[in-house]
Amino acid sequence: MTAAPPRVEQRTRANGIELAWDSFGDPAAEPLLLVMGLGAQMVAWDDAFCARLAEAGGHRVIRFDNRDIGHSTHLTLLGVPDIQALMAQAMAGLPLRAPYDLRDMAADCVGLLDALGIARAHIVGASM
């Protein structure tokens, strides 16, 4: 694969926060949203890989930084969750109290797509 040209990062307000994102390919092409897993920035989706998906698949490939990661909003006022305490609560069957959960992060994805005027998209995710 050849190296892709540098992308221009953009920021969009969605779901009450600011999300950093960029895209590859024709903006009018069928969208493909790349969602990175816990603790990793969007650049973990390699530029050349994204460009190849756009070229070979004919997609507009969109990648973004989740909340609290990279150049998206960092929710520092909510504090850092105590992972050990959360695991103990889960093992004890107690309700978890975290500043946000996967539903919020899924809403971030929908909010980004809405802000970009995208009604439907293919979604590809990478987990921990």
Give residue spans per PLM region.
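Conserved HGGG/HGGXW glycine-rich cap/lid loop of the alpha/beta-hydrolase fold
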Residues: 17-91
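A contiguous binding-surface segment within folded domains or other stable secondary-structure elements
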Residues: 5-9, 113, 123
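Active-site loop->helix "elbow" adjoining a glycine-rich segment at hydrolase catalytic centers
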Residues: 105, 127-128
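N-terminal cap/lid segment of alpha/beta-hydrolase-fold proteins
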Residues: 2-18
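Conserved alpha/beta-hydrolase "nucleophile elbow" surrounding the catalytic nucleophile
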Residues: 36, 121, 125-127
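Conserved acidic catalytic loop of the alpha/beta-hydrolase fold
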Residues: 88-121
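A generic structural signal for well-ordered alpha-helical segments
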Residues: 12, 53-54, 113
